[in-house]
C-alpha cells in the first residue's frame, strides 16, 4: 500500500489530504509499495510542481507543489504530478543522465521542448478529468 505524507500549511495539507485518496485510486496507485512525500512549499523554481523518483535511494517519490492562494491551482498541479508518479511507478518514465529522460524505452534530451515531452502531454491530458472526479467524490 502507498504510504503518504503531506507537508505544508494546515489549509493546503488538509485540502490535499481530502482529494488525494481519489487521485490515488483513479491512477491505481493503491497497491504501490513505495512511499510518497508531497511538499507544498515554494521549492520548484519556475514550475508549478515537480516530481522526483527517489525510490532507488529512499523508497519514495517526492512531489513538490508551489503553494497557491487558489486551491484549484494546487489541485491541478497535484493531479498533474500524480500522473508522473504513476508513470514512474509503472517504469514508463525514468530519469537518465544529464537531465535526460527515458519514456517507454526512448531517450529524450533535457532540451526537448516541455510541451513536446510525451509524459507531459499525458499528464496535461489527464489532470482536469482526474481533478473533476476527485472533487465529485
Regions found by a protein language model. Give the residues of each.
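Hydrophobic or amphipathic, alpha-helical segments that drive membrane association/targeting
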Residues: 1-10, 36-47
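Active-site scaffold of zinc-dependent metalloenzymes
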Residues: 41-73
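Soluble non-cytosolic domains of exported or imported proteins
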Residues: 10, 14, 72-73, 77, ...
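Zn2+-dependent metallopeptidase catalytic core
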Residues: 11-33
Amino acid at each position: 500500500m502507498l504510504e503518504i505524507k503531506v507537508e505544508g500549511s494546515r489549509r493546503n495539507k488538509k485540502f490535499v489530504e481530502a482529494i488525494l485518496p481519489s487521485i490515488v485510486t483513479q491512477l491505481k496507485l493503491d497497491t504501490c509499495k513505495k512511499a510518497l512525500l508531497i511538499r507544498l512549499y515554494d521549492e520548484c523554481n519556475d514550475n508549478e510542481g515537480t516530481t522526483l523518483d527517489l525510490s532507488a535511494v529512499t523508497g519514495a517519490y517526492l512531489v513538490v507543489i508551489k503553494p497557491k492562494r487558489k486551491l484549484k491551482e494546487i489541485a491541478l498541479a497535484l493531479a498533474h504530478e500524480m500522473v508522473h508518479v504513476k508513470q514512474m511507478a509503472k517504469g514508463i518514465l525514468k530519469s537518465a543522465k544529464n537531465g535526460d529522460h527515458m519514456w517507454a524505452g526512448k531517450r529524450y534530451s533535457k532540451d526537448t521542448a516541455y510541451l513536446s515531452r510525451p509524459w507531459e502531454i499525458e499528464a496535461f491530458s489527464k489532470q482536469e478529468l482526474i481533478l473533476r472526479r476527485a472533487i465529485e467524490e
